[in-house]
Amino acid sequence: MSGNTIGNVFRVTTWGESHGGAIGAVIDGCPPGLGLSEQHIQAALDRRKPGVGAFATPRQETDRIEILSGVFEGRTTGTPIALLIRNRDANSGAYDGLRNIFRPGHGDYTYFKKYGLRDHRGGGRASGRETAARVAAGAVAALVTAAAGIDVLAYTIALGGVSISESGTTVNRESLANPLCCPDQEAARRMTGRLEEARNAGDSLGGIVGIVVRGCPAGLGEPVFDKMDAQLAGALMSIGTVKGVEIGAGFAVAGMKGSESNDPLSPGGFLANASGGILAGITNGEQINMRVACKPIPSISRSQKTVDREGNPVTLSIGGRHDVCVIPRIIPVCEAMVQIVLADFLLRQKAVTL
């Protein structure tokens, strides 16, 4: 299986399956001398670990990080950093009845068609459990971006059809200090109601995550095929639940006039930001704004039609332990992927300028 590595200079490879012994990441290209501890990575992992919140999977993984290499006396050495997270609460027996059945909305069918076999235990490599390794790697990337003054923040824009009032809503760490990472408290209350309804109905919900990048310098990004927006979108789309990414005004530009979509400049800087902080694939120094559409969790207890490996029809109701919605656990995953892309471009920029 290829496609497990992202990055050119700051390179991250993740490995492991949902019900294997462990998952983890190897980071190559991290500069030496950065202060790095297990506590720093653990703080990021604790934001996405399972078993936290009323609507999260009851799978109780501690997600304790272990740094195996690349750090000496609390500082990165410049050699590959190996990160390990042991799986301690896998309940593989809950998936025995799914060995020969394809779950709707999952990668079961496509993995089987590609490889001729699949790990039916929680989705194997296709499981959202893999994203814990991304979050761990993103915490390391955040050290690189923080040194450049960059701050990445993701938050809930919409959940189950309830959207925040973006006009006048302040997005900062203080306003997001709630279980749904939602800056609009009234919207968060209604979102919680939708989650309760979906859980009681044996169903799940999707949502939209917003991402803002502040303090990003102008000049990052590589034309033509390695444009900043192309790499950010690709990194975010690599998250299993993500089905769409908008940058800046996104799809709304299709209904605009050029006079509306162009961002005028003045001696003091840009007067608008429909571009979302990126022009011609290169950052312009303005805030990078993104929106990420996340599909509902496909594992639901409601009856669904599917087939088995022989093509026979099956009616399936999925047991096991599952979230009602990927939000808010997906939020640190989105932040991590953006951090990894930005760290890579920061280091690449050092190779093209004196």
From Swiss-Prot:
Lineage: Bacteria, Pseudomonadati, Thermodesulfobacteriota, Syntrophia, Syntrophales
Residues the record lists as binding FMN: R125, A126, S127, A280, K295, P296, I297, P298, S299, R321
Keywords: Amino-acid biosynthesis, Aromatic amino acid biosynthesis, FAD, Flavoprotein, FMN, Lyase, NADP
Any single Gene Ontology cellular-component annotation: cytosol
Note accompanying the cofactor annotation: Reduced FMN (FMNH(2)).
Pathway: Metabolic intermediate biosynthesis; chorismate biosynthesis; chorismate from D-erythrose 4-phosphate and phosphoenolpyruvate: step 7/7
Catalytic function, reaction form: 5-O-(1-carboxyvinyl)-3-phosphoshikimate = chorismate + phosphate
Keyword Cytoplasm: no
GO molecular function: chorismate synthase activity; FMN binding
Signal sequence extent: none
Lineage top rank: taxon: Bacteria
InterPro entries, per the entry: Chorismate_synth (IPR000453), Chorismate_synth_AroC_sf (IPR035904), Chorismate_synthase_CS (IPR020541)
Positions of NADP(+) binding: R48
UniProt GO BP: amino acid biosynthetic process; aromatic amino acid family biosynthetic process; chorismate biosynthetic process
Gene3D superfamilies listed in its UniProt record: Chorismate synthase AroC
Protein name: Chorismate synthase
Entry similarity comment: Belongs to the chorismate synthase family.
Oligomeric form and interacting partners: Homotetramer.
Function of the molecule: This reaction introduces a second double bond into the aromatic ring system.
EC number of this enzyme: 4.2.3.5
Cofactor: FMNH2
Coiled coil: none
